[in-house]
Amino acid sequence: MRFSLSSADLQEWNGDVLAVGLPQGDVDATATALEQRFAGITDALKQQEFKGKPGDQLVITPLGGGPQRLVVLGLGESDAIDTERLRGAAARAAKAAIGCEGSLGLQLPCAGSDAQEAARICAEAVRLCLYKDQRFRKEPDPRRIPEALELIDLSPAAESGFAAVNATCAGVELARELVAAPPNVVTPAALADTAAGIAKDHGLELKVLERSDCEAKGMGAFLAVSQGSDLPPKFIHLIYRPEGEVKRRVALVGKGLTFDSGGYNLKVGAAQIDMMKFDMGGSAAVLGAMRSIAELKPAGVEVHMVVASCENMVNGSAVHPGDIVMAANGMTIEINNTDAEGRLTLADALLYACEQKPDAVVDLATLTGACVIALGDEMAGLWSNNDDLAEALDAAAQTGGEGLWRMPLRQSYKDGLKSLLADMKNTGPRPGGSITAALFLKEFVAKDTAWAHIDIAGPVWSDKGKGVNPAGATGYGVRTLVNWVLAQS
């Protein structure tokens, strides 16, 4: 999508759709100005009882020349217009422009944000909310959407805000496509192929470990999960190396269960087995982030992406409840629940990631229903052994408009993972389940390595769509990871 600034005012701008944001208290003055060009707009606003409140919206088709469509958006009180409200208004403008091609002109008051930030927020919102996945339809619906966004009445400094938008959004869209695709399409091999495509297109390094390679490295936890599937597991390591000196090295680890039946602890009832295609949402996020990072080429930061991908299925070879397996570090794990498989795959993935000697490791996983119960479907949970890393990720999430909330890593809860026979069990008691899951993962992180775990089970999917996310896969995590990596360059 093309982004630019327009120096034209509301009287002069000539594009296809003009969207104007009005705060409460400014409606009459702005309506009077619009009346000079769009006769009858004042009466239309009164008839609609448009007050400028958040959610107020009027769409009209002006007579005569000029824009095909005029969109007036309520923004609420001026002092309450923050970045989240700007993002929402830009998304509403884009949705109101569907059906028109050409350019969308957008004027929003950005007093509470600097011009560069406002430009980035609006551009990301417009592109992301216009996304629609029609890959699996025989006859895709014809769509007419704006091809360009022009921001009106912003200072020239705002231009730099567009720099990373298309690359970041392309990563989000890749993640959405991977999560949304059915499990007969996105398999472990397909994830490896996606990584290969990114490596080829952007000059990254790629290593894919096959089952025999994983056996040689002693990845018994990962391989135990995979043994019930006819599809071979793939352990994927994608590397971005910057030109020049490497000042920071980070690892992004994503859970890559392309389908999770639950194993012998089969998912039933409310477990929504039909939606378990999205159990690879963590791998989608890190692959999407790597696609964006590879295009943006941040200086000084080396990025390692690690995904242990397989299916969790049921057959005569599948792991049993009660089996004891050994991770690559020699730690033994009693599997008291085969449906807590993601942490087993992540155990060996985290150990491998730490072998790369990173300054920080961040893992993303659709790990627990407990996190969804605690935080709902708009927030991910964050656990970390390092305050600086947690704060940096929180800032990156806020910049990207992705909900993230730090959760306690309470050590006393680790007692719930004690096993009579093995070093630990893979699940603890139901209360505090997302915390014990994080404590389990922590056991596989090198002692002095900064680490964060982000449970994205809630926001990975949106049933109805909201804000910049259409219904379906959200691509959650890509913007947070990209912003975090860029902040270190």
UniProtKB/Swiss-Prot annotation:
Q: Which CDD domains does the protein's record reference?
A: Peptidase_M17
Its UniProt entry gives the catalysed reaction(s) as: Release of an N-terminal amino acid, Xaa-|-Yaa-, in which Xaa is preferably Leu, but may be other amino acids including Pro although not Arg or Lys, and Yaa may be Pro. Amino acid amides and methyl esters are also readily hydrolyzed, but rates on arylamides are exceedingly low; Release of an N-terminal amino acid, preferentially leucine, but not glutamic or aspartic acids
Please share the entry's free-text remark on the cofactor: Binds 2 manganese ions per subunit.
Kindly list the places in or outside the cell where this protein is found, as annotated in its UniProt entry. Answer: Cytoplasm
Q: Which InterPro entries does the protein's record reference?
A: Leucine_aapep/pepB, Macro_dom-like, Peptidase_M17_C, Peptidase_M17_leu_NH2_pept, Peptidase_M17_N
Q: Please name one Pfam family that this protein belongs to.
A: Peptidase_M17_N
GO-annotated cellular components? cytoplasm
**Mind telling me which PANTHER family this protein's record contains?**
CYTOSOL AMINOPEPTIDASE, LEUCINE AMINOPEPTIDASE-RELATED
Name of this chain's protein: Probable cytosol aminopeptidase
Native source organism of the sequence: Synechococcus sp. (strain CC9605)
For this protein's source organism, the top of the classification is: Bacteria, Bacillati, Cyanobacteriota, Cyanophyceae, Synechococcales
